[in-house]
Amino acid sequence: MSPGSRGRPRQRLEDRGLMKPPSLSKRRLLPRVQFLPLLLLALAMGLAFYIVWNSWHPGVEEMSRSRDLRVPLIGSLSEAKLRLVVGQLDPQRLWGTFLRPLLIVRPPGSSGNLQVRKFLEATLQSLSAGWHVELDPFTASTPLGPLDFGNVVATLDPGAARHLTLACHYDSKFFPPGLPPFVGATDSAVPCALLLELVQALDAMLSRIKQQAAPVTLQLLFLDGEEALKEWGPKDSLYGSRHLAQIMESIPHSPGPTRIQAIELFVLLDLLGASSPIFFSHFPRTARWFQRLRSIEKRLHRLNLLQSHPQEVMYFQPGEPPGPVEDDHIPFLRRGVPVLHLIATPFPAVWHTPADTEANLHPPTVHNLSRILAVFLAEYLGL
C-alpha cells in the first residue's frame, strides 16, 4: 500500500473542465475618421452606465449561468471582521460538547452508530438559526448481511437556489469482535465536531443571512457507511454517499432541476486532527477555493491567530497530491458536482489502528483548522 492510497483501489476520475467561450466573429472596422468619435462616445456611455449600476447594486458579484464557480473575493473580510469571526469559536465547546460524544465505537448498524446519529440530529435542531434537518434512513446489502444506515442532512435555508455543502462521515470502521475498539478520532470524529462547532459559533451570523434570503445557503451532510465492512470495493464502501447522491439527483429543486445541481461547492473533510497535516488541491476545477484556504491560513498566521503554527508548517501546500483517494465525494463528483477534498495526505500514522484516539489528537491543529474554515465560510457566504 503506497502512502495516500488509503488501501483502496485507485481510480482516476477526469475533473470536468470549464468550457471556453466561443471567440467573437471578426467584423469590418469603420474608417478611422468615423471610428474615433464613436469609440470615445461608447467609452463615455459605458463609464456612466458602470457608475450608475454600481450605485444601485453595490457589491453584486456576477454569476455564471453555467455550473462554473464564483470567483473568490480575495481578502473580503476586514481584519476587524476576521477577528470577530475567529472570536466566536470556543475550543472547549468543540472538544467537550461536540467531539467527546462522538468518540465511541460506531460502525453501521450498531447502537453506537444510532447514538451518534441522534446526537447529530439533536444538536443541529437546537441551533437558533432554525436548520431544516432531514434523515435519510435506508437498508443495504453488505458482506455482513443487510444493515441499516442513516444519513443526516441539514440545510440552513432549503429555499435558497444554491448550496455550499460541507460533508463528512460519522461511522467508524468495523473491526471483528475480540479486537481492540476503534473509535476513529481522526476518521472522522474530528471532522464531524468541526462542522458542529462552525455552525454553533456562527449561529447568529447564519441566522441573519437566512432572514435575508441569500441566494447561497449552507448545507451539512453527515454520511453513514463510508468505511468498507470487509474489503474496499464499489459495492462495499461509500454506502451513505452513494445512496444520498442518487436520492438528491431525483429530488426537484428550484431553479432546478434537482438538488444535486444546487450544490455549488462540495467540501469533504476527512482524516483531520493529527499534528502537521498536509492538504493538496485534488481537482483543477476547485483550485481557486483551495488557494483561498491557503491565503486564509497565511493571513491568520501573520495575525498570530494560529497556535503551534511556525511558518514552515503550512497545512495547505502547492503541488500535486500523492495520488487519487476514493472517498465520499466520488458519487457526487461523478454527477458533475465541484469537489474540494480536504483530507490529510499522507494519512495520519494512526489511520485504521486502535491508536486513532483522543490521546493522539493535536488540539492546536484542530483549533487552527476551525479558524481557517470559519473564515472561509464567512467569506464565501458573506457573513
UniProtKB/Swiss-Prot annotation:
EC number: 2.3.2.5
Active site location: E226, D270
List of residues binding Zn(2+): D187, E227, H352
Name of the protein this chain belongs to: Glutaminyl-peptide cyclotransferase-like protein
Naturally occurring in which organism (per UniProt): Mus musculus
GO biological process entries: peptidyl-pyroglutamic acid biosynthetic process, using glutaminyl-peptide cyclotransferase
Catalytic activity: N-terminal L-glutaminyl-[peptide] = N-terminal 5-oxo-L-prolyl-[peptide] + NH4(+)
Subcellular location: Golgi apparatus membrane
The organism's place on the tree of life at top rank: Eukaryota
